[in-house]
Amino acid sequence: MKPAFFRTHPYISLLFPCLLPFASIAPPACGPVLGAQTGAGEVSVREAVRRELHEHPELVLDILKENSETVLEIAQQGNMLRRRKSLLAQWEQDVKQRKIVKLDDRSFRGKADAPVTMVVYSDFTCPYCRQAEYDVSRLLQKYDGKLRMTFKALPKEDPVSATAAKFATAAFLLDPVKGWEFHDALFNGSEQYEREGEEFLKKTAESLGYDFKKLKSAANSPAVRQRLDFDGKEADNLGISGTPHFLINDLMVRGAVGRELFEEAVETALRHAGKQ
């Protein structure tokens, strides 16, 4: 029977494979020599350590505390490997299902005939979206000529998020090229925007050469409302919930997965497009 400690903390037993490398437990004085033959057979160092941990479970917490950074690193690596494995399996299924998205009236970053298209569904007030923007910009640099990107605002229901989406969408409609500058400024200054509201939008727009009255009028126009509604319904049809979300050709990527997984997604898309 397991000690009460393990019955009340069942997850601790699962940590043994990670803990054993850290444990340095000397055999008791005058005890049997490890590796000697006994009635139960040869006793290994690993078995001795495991037995010691079971007999003194408080050592488990001591080992965790003393090696907390290393244990955390191992856990993070394991989580990353598990997530990568799951994504690779998902992507093999994704490429078999064509995703239908509207792109003909959108502004792009990257070469027009790039073999890989990334559609970013994002929110200007989402911290994970801001984090992912940095990775996306690096991807565009690394895969210059092979990757293009467009942006679709997917705001939350709160007015701060919705207003940012309306103004950014209007900026693209008024000037598809300058719209990217507004997009960048809004992401880079999102915290300031959340503090200042429309005043930040006005300063940003005017610094980029927009007529703010025209921009504000466009932001509240039926054209902007229709585009945002369309993109929201498109996201629903794709099974997208939450931001950020990315469609890389037909591969679905949810969340700010980090540079390495983004690169793997692009490489996978290139391979299936025959352009690697």
Where do the PLM segments sit?
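N-terminal secretory signal peptides that target proteins for export/translocation
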Residues: M1-T8
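Solvent-exposed, acidic/flexible segments
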Residues: T38, E42, R46, L53, ...
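Bacterial N-terminal signal peptides
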Residues: S13-P27
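Structural alpha/beta surface segment adjacent to cysteine/selenocysteine redox centers
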Residues: V119, R130-E206, D236-S241
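C-terminal cap of thioredoxin/glutaredoxin-like
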Residues: G41-L53, L59, T70-A75, K203-Q276
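A short beta-strand-turn-helix
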Residues: I100-V116, Q141
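The canonical Cys-X-X-Cys-His
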Residues: D123-A132, P244-L247
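N-terminal targeting signals for export/organelle localization
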Residues: P17, P28-K96
